[in-house]
Amino acid sequence: MSFQYPLLAPMTNSSVATNSNQPFLGQPWLVEERDACGVGFIANLRGKPDHTLVEQALKALGCMEHRGGCSADNDSGDGAGVMTAIPRELLAQWFNTRNLPMPDGDRLGVGMVFLPQEPSAREVARAYVEEVVRLEKLTVLGWREVPVNSDVLGIQAKNNQPHIEQILVTCPEGCAGDELDRRLYIARSIIGKKLAEDFYVCSFSCRTIVYKGMVRSIILGEFYLDLKNPGYTSNFAVYHRRFSTNTMPKWPLAQPMRLLGHNGEINTLLGNINWMAAREKELEVSGWTKAELEALTPIVNQANSDSYNLDSALELLVRTGRSPLEAAMILVPEAYKNQPALKDYPEISDFHDYYSGLQEPWDGPALLVFSDGKIVGAGLDRNGLRPARYCITKDDYIVLGSEAGVVDLPEVDIVEKGRLAPGQMIAVDLAEQKILKNYQIKQQAAQKYPYGEWIKIQRQTVASDSFAEKTLFNDAQTVLQQQAAFGYTAEDVEMVVVPMASQGKEPTFCMGDDTPLAVLSHKPRLLYDYFKQRFAQVTNPPIDPLRENLVMSLAMFLGKRGNLLEPKAESARTIKLRSPLVNEVELQAIKTGQLQVAEVSTLYDLDGVNSLETALDNLVKTAIATVQAGAEILVLTDRPNGAILTENQSFIPPLLAVGAVHHHLIRAGLRLKASLIVDTAQCWSTHHFACLVGYGASAICPYLALESVRQWWLDEKTQKLMENGRLDRIDLPTALKNYRQSVEAGLFKILSKMGISLLASYHGAQIFEAIGLGAELVEYAFAGTTSRVGGLTIADVAGEVMVFHGMAFPEMAKKLENFGFVNYRPGGEYHMNSPEMSKSLHKAVAAYKVGGNGNNGEAYDHYELYRQYLKDRPVTALRDLLDFNADQPAISLEEVESVESIVKRFCTGGMSLGALSREAHETLAIAMNRLGAKSNSGEGGEDVVRYLTLDDVDSEGNSPTLPHLHGLQNGDTANSAIKQIASGRFGVTPEYLMSGKQLEIKMAQGAKPGEGGQLPGKKVSEYIAMLRRSKPGVTLISPPPHHDIYSIEDLAQLIYDLHQINPEAQVSVKLVAEIGIGTIAAGVAKANADIIQISGHDGGTGASPLSSIKHAGSPWELGVTEVHRVLMENQLRDRVLLRADGGLKTGWDVVMAALMGAEEYGFGSIAMIAEGCIMARVCHTNNCPVGVATQQERLRQRFKGVPGQVVNFFYFIAEEVRSLLAHLGYRSLDDIIGRTDLLKVRSDVQLSKTQNLTLDCLLNLPDTKQNRQWLNHEPVHSNGPVLDDDILADPDIQEAINHQTTATKTYRLVNTDRTVGTRLSGAIAKKYGNNGFEGNITLNFQGAAGQSFGAFNLDGMTLHLQGEANDYVGKGMNGGEIVIVPHPQASFAPEDNVIIGNTCLYGATGGNLYANGRAGERFAVRNSVGKAVIEGAGDHCCEYMTGGVIVVLGPVGRNVGAGMTGGLAYFLDEVGDLPEKINPEIITLQRITASKGEEQLKSLITAHVEHTGSPKGKAILANWSDYLGKFWQAVPPSEKDSPEANGDVSLTGEKTLTSV
């Protein structure tokens, strides 16, 4: 049987394009603005408050300018500010002029207030503020107008400038300090609720004050004249420079906030806001009245930024009695599990364990700098994703910041240079005049209460019990009936559940999703299918769930959540689960445990589509009443009482049930009183679990999925497959455990792609976008979820449920329906990439002859069949709902721009050589170069032979230069115009970067955004290994994030790096469409990118988890229109060229993309089809039958494609574009880009599910009909004047480059000198390639080097630095030497201090680095060939290494060698704790037994001493026999038989493969 929806009446323009039930377009913090920054503090313990410290804070702020951003006017800053102590000496002048006595110390409260500019509104605001202050029994002393110089502001900042005044208040005797701050906090909260428009209180305290504004950092002190006044003194300062993805100045969003300066992004914000809103109804703390606590609410607000909300949560804890340090520990906890260092501090683990059951972490990259005036401190997130460097002087002066070297302190006075490691804190107790280090801080907080005892007594843990093996149903037919009724299809069982049970991992697939969106499909879909997973890109990074799993957890807690504000033993009364998937045995244990459990059925009597809404209302009412009656756990179950669902019964979809109950309990103020468990038949894939947890479920029992596993294992066919060896033999318990393991691994991946470590933080966070759900439904059950195009009502959902129900009743077929959602099948779901489409295209491109003089009729006929096939398709994509709306008469084709002009806008997708065969990859490149278009190298480097222009092609189209290709012409080149820089940095060398016209930073991939990649060893041939600087057969891992891009300012730095090495190449950034991409793109434009590429969710892939292909990302139509709109609104559209890709197949697609704002167009899968791909959909198996996507030699020989076929395809596309332009009456694509007024909603479309779609978000773009100036882009953006320009301008340097001679030069550096040496490297590589330069240039530097010092260094270059360096030293280093030593006057021991930052030697393809000191996190991450000696490192050292040699002469952090598949590393372990810090998944740790290994180690240390004079190195060499036994050697499997690791192996000459 095949079930289809009945077609509804055709849509009309009005019913689709407009809808009174307006869709929700997203929270402001998601779609309007994200931010990042540079942040830090300065404190002086011993001295009195002075003005010098304030001056130094302003200077430090100025040194962070490159971490900030500016508005479209390039002058108005995104925000800068300082927090200091109250400047009493300055304010004394105000009191003196008024003959007022100045209140003592902490009896004076000062509010820094942004008031309306309009005088009458200002008076109203002042009066209300004074009224509220007096109600708090405080005395208003007066208002002080803050002196400012508005002339220094940018145009936009000036237009939005508030009137700035300070209100001065005092309190009665006995009310000072903390009590005064409490009253000011209450007053400010009350004031803020009424005066929200054009009004903001920056700070209101008796201890701290905040000066901030929408200015550049160097302007802050010029604007606020107070800050330059010698009477402005302080003993501490917190400073912050903001980079916003928006350009509309908003003064209140500058930082610091009231307590906090935040660098990073909270990924879990919506969940944190929802849970904090739930807590507001139950706030209770001794010493506070209920009325006072209610006055504080709402504490958080969806309209505010992540930093603002985190500050608000932090302030609640601080003002109710916690120190800022303890509050930060609660809200942003460290990863205390799997932390060897905490074994000596069990109380700290107990503290975090206790609060893990009360407070979900605010998760995401974060350097927090905070102060309440008594304490000033800083803390880092659990993953250490922001830099934090500090130094301490001998007279207890401490400077901490995002970069080293921002304050110029005498080197002789510095006693310590350090960094915060992941989860660590440092603080200054200003009252006690003490510097507090990490464990001292945490012990102090953890020992206040017996948290460990409370947990031991109160908490119950549900162990992972064995699964029930007894089947629920007696016969297979009943199972099929239940599966059908609950929405299973044959593919769900065979391609999802069975692989999970048999293999213990999620199924992998390829080629992307080419089926209709759920709301557009004529097939029934589950409610889950309307939700698209969001993911991290640019503003925060994804994380690696495999290699960095030690910081992740799926643990969940059941029961009532206790009072966050007052620790009590009973708050630990919870049940802890290892993961949210509970089996039947575990569910029963929960029901019989210590907490009150109640079941609520989600079944209802089937009585038409309206019966679901009635059942839902009843469910919500029952849930509320049950919780009010004392239930602590609510089990929402769709298990029928009679064991099976009957013909007259249906069920509320579990996602709808849990979302509705979750939100209605929040609204009723009951959510924290009970946890929700979902006991359901309709949950089997990882996406289903993620949705349920994301909308409020704490645990899920997928009873029908578990039953499906049992039935599969018991099936005779399964047993026979195991008997004959076609399936691995496993028993039933193993199959059930495999299923659980697969779900858990999939959940880790879904969390990690958003950059979230803990499921507790994902819980209720709603990190999805709904596509196709109506506003009423969303508000009812999924409030706060973006749903831009509207869609289904509750009745429509009921209709889908009934369709599935109709498959099972009254009579079930003999097998489950196969709708072909994954694999194409005749009669199944429509697939854009079908065999029919492929065949017609193959015929067209084969028949077309360039210059055919009118003889191409047959070719055009075939192309017309191809075009019609796609034109007449069922509605599949959002663009299919639109049609052209010409506003002028058609013109003749001769008047339209040429094919040759149009094809220059075309690009191929970034498909790697590794995913594609060499033949297919080079064929695409040659074709695009013939067209004057652009091919993309993808990840993996490129053979230098491809940079040649062919001049040896014979009459048969063959060339000895590229003998494996056919159909060649003289003048061809296989050089990819676009060179991709992906997270693995494989083959990214100076020569590679210099050979590109564009350099593409791949932030995400359409088919698997937020995920990394892995090229299996079997695909790494000798040729691939040569290109990627690896060894054949070694698995090559591309991390999920770029490890030098954790935020928008990090991306700006990489863009800067690429512009630095190749100033003639454009830099593009590839993003994937998701809600909020517009504001991300605005940040990318401000980060100085030249091109932004928006990929749709339907992009192709060589291999990806099936759940990612189907459920991650959004359509490019939503992405392109959002980006175009935001860039236009922010006056940034002229800065970047916009490119669209994802499922483009015809000229009609190109014109649609152009009308929506795209200027260039990417083609991936379809270009492969044009060269011969037959859509076999086996890319992920390495068995492509036509040699397109395989590395197997025998299969590659089957490749028959020639460049001409691809050329022909793009000519067809361009001709179609021309005909459509003529039809619209326009002469060029430039004339129609961004012109959505030329689009209208189709009136002839018939959708089967809803008439409630609204396409306003696609059609309502800024009117650009007249103003087209934004299409005029600067060819390549500049970095402006840089130190390298001065170096290159030196005649001696020019002489050395041009004549390969020797030159030595000396320069001073500061931290704003970034990417030093790289432009010199590019100039050499352009002339000589990677290895051809035989001269030698030595550059000596002194000072604090900015980021990316020595990036892409080349052979023949030596950089020697006295001082210190920030992050990314030696990034992409290809050769030469980098030497870094402390300043000559430094008095500290180098081996105990930090000298270089995070992520150094990232992706190095050669060279040597010697650093006389310690490095930060992720040293030598993805190192390919580089060698280095350092004297200590942070976490994740040598992560993903594939080659090279690393020596560490000091302590390291945890997770050493994670994902390390090649190379060797040596670690000096004087403490004996290295084994517990190693990630043992791949590498083996062994002592050095091979003589070649000892020789290698000693020679590198010897070289280190020669270059740096290292005292530690000298001591080791002087006592070699004593030290040798303390070294460990980390050896991956690929190196176990190398002579350095294995003394039994003789040294043989290594084979070197060169390009062929």
Curated annotation (Swiss-Prot):
The active site is at 37 (for gatase activity). Keywords: 3Fe-4S, Amino-acid biosynthesis, FAD, Flavoprotein, FMN, Glutamate biosynthesis, Glutamine amidotransferase, Iron, Iron-sulfur, Metal-binding, Oxidoreductase. Pfam families: GATase_2, Glu_syn_central, Glu_synthase, GXGXG. Pathway: Amino-acid biosynthesis; L-glutamate biosynthesis via GLT pathway; L-glutamate from 2-oxoglutarate and L-glutamine (ferredoxin route): step 1/1; Energy metabolism; nitrogen metabolism. Binds 1 [3Fe-4S] cluster. Its cofactor is [3Fe-4S] cluster; FAD; FMN. One of its GO terms (biological process) is L-glutamate biosynthetic process. Residues 37-431 form the Glutamine amidotransferase type-2 domain. [3Fe-4S] cluster binds at residues 1173, 1179, 1184. It comes from the Bacteria. Residues 1533-1556 are annotated as: Disordered. It catalyses: 2 oxidized [2Fe-2S]-[ferredoxin] + 2 L-glutamate = L-glutamine + 2 reduced [2Fe-2S]-[ferredoxin] + 2-oxoglutarate + 2 H(+). GO terms for molecular function: 3 iron, 4 sulfur cluster binding; glutamate synthase (ferredoxin) activity; glutamate synthase activity; metal ion binding. CDD domains: gltB_C, GltS, GltS_FMN. Its EC number is 1.4.7.1. Belongs to the glutamate synthase family. This is Ferredoxin-dependent glutamate synthase 2. The lineage of its organism: Bacteria, Bacillati, Cyanobacteriota, Cyanophyceae, Synechococcales. The gene is gltS.
